[in-house]
A protein has these predicted regions:
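Short, recurring structural edge motifs at helix starts
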Residues: 6-11, 70-75
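A short, surface-exposed helix-loop junction/capping segment
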Residues: 1-5
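A cross-family detector of function-defining hotspots
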Residues: 16-58, 71-72, 76-143
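Helix-adjacent hinge/juxtasegments
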Residues: 61-71
Length: 143
């Protein structure tokens, strides 16, 4: 499963509607609304959580995965040492935040979070970018 910064994950492109995603992945294993009334799809086999933003016409805008073969810029990263992976990436600015045994490593320019526990990557979060000038999402999907 390819994590594609700024664009999406696997065959899913930021800006897709739920029908586009269902066409590619099928019905989700679970679906619910979060506290902001966004629609959340969970796909167990792919270890994938997708967010469709309520205030953006239910467009796909955020993904979380812990899929064992998830890759970022050509390298598998789940279970790998977080320090080695971050050093190997071309992204230079990272914000780090600790929560108990978990550490989030956030790169704002790619809206990418690499989450680690005990020094190993356990999941990756990626979101659609926001245009600073217009304060609106940059939707890569044009269909």
């Amino acid at each position: 499963m390819k994590i594609d910064p700024k664009n999406g994950i696997a065959d899913l492109i930021f800006g897709m509607k739920m029908t586009h995603v269902e066409h590619l992945l099928g019905e989700p294993d679970r679906q619910f609304h979060d506290e902001d009334d966004n629609v959340i799809y969970l796909y167990n086999k792919q270890k994938l959580r997708l967010t469709f933003y309520a205030d953006e016409d239910l467009r796909f805008g955020y993904a979380i995965t812990s899929y064992p073969n998830a890759s970022l810029l050509g390298q598998a990263i789940i279970g790998k040492p977080v320090g080695e992976v971050i050093e190997s990436l071309p992204f230079t600015t990272w914000e780090t935040e600790d929560f108990d045994s978990v550490t989030n490593h956030f790169n704002e320019s790619n809206w990418l979070t690499i989450q680690s526990e005990f020094g190993a990557i356990i999941r990756v979060e990626i979101g659609a970018l926001i245009d600073d000038a217009t304060d609106s999402f940059i939707w890569r999907f044009k269909g």
